[in-house]
Structures are given as structure tokens and as C-alpha cells.
Amino acid sequence: MIAKASTISHGANAIRYSVNKEKADIVKANLLPDNISPEAMYGRMMLVQKKYAEKINKGRPLGRNVIRIEISPSEEESRGWTMDDWLRLSNEFIRVFDSIDLSGKTKRASSQHTNLKNSQYIVALHRDSQSGILHLHIDANRVDMDEKSMIAIRLARGLFWLRTSSTRNEAGYSLKK
């Protein structure tokens, strides 16, 4: 299993891609209403960011306002999975991701942990257009419902998750730097 995460400035386009891609299935909408358009999802995220703008960025909009995560289990791992299995994977990934101390990477105590579980996000299941391999896209608001801005750095630099059989933490994942 491989996953990558980064903060991005094109959140509206990322959400639109995640939700509207051909054969995409919505796995979960966290703290967002069901059956709304990608534009409405992004709009609701921006309302939360505006509400807390003074507190989180001295009133200025965040440049990179969405956390984009892609999770790709191997074809062998995910063969026969149901939508409930994909939901479990996304929930477990978010739980583990939130538990990682990132302050060493960011050099800022305020970036110690993410709080995705208490953030607006959408999880969509995609099929690779060439191989047909299934993978998840998660697009999350960088501002959680507790008024905190998460991860001011680009996470993709060197942060990858691999499922290993030798070295594991309690969730069965190791962080490769």
C-alpha cells in the first residue's frame, strides 16, 4: 500500500475531479451534507476557513487550503473489497495519519498533528484508467472544526506509507522518509 499527501492550492478542482470522475464512488463525506455538488463542498470548506481566518492566518486566505491524499492498496490487498472495506481503510488511514507527530518535519509545534477526523472531507473511490486498480482520493479542509490550520508545509515531500510485513506500528503501516 502506498499513499501520499500534500497541501494544495487547487482544492476546488481536486474535489471536482474526485467526485465527478467517471465511475467514481463516494465512500464518505465527513461533516458535509450528502448529495451536494463538489462546488458546494468546496464552498462549505471556504466558509469555515473564512469564519476562522483572523485566528489562523491573520485574516488572509490560506494559499494551500486543502489537504489532498491518495491511497493505493495493491490489487492483491484490495481484491474483493466491498464499499465497507474501503470505508474502513479510509477511517483507519485518517486515524493513523492524525496520530503522526509532524512537528519535526515542519519545525513548528503548531503543526504537531493533523485533525482530519474533525475536518470536512470527501473520500472517493477511483479506478485507474489504464490498469483498473482501485484507489482512494481524500480531499480535506486544512482548517478543522476546532479553528486550527493543519500542516503548513507540503506533506508530499518524502512522506509515503507502505504496508510492510516486517516493521509495523500497531496499525500495520510504516512511514518511509
Task: Please identify what each model-predicted range represents.
Residues M1-K177:
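N-terminal nicking endonuclease/strand-transfer module with a His-rich metal-binding environment
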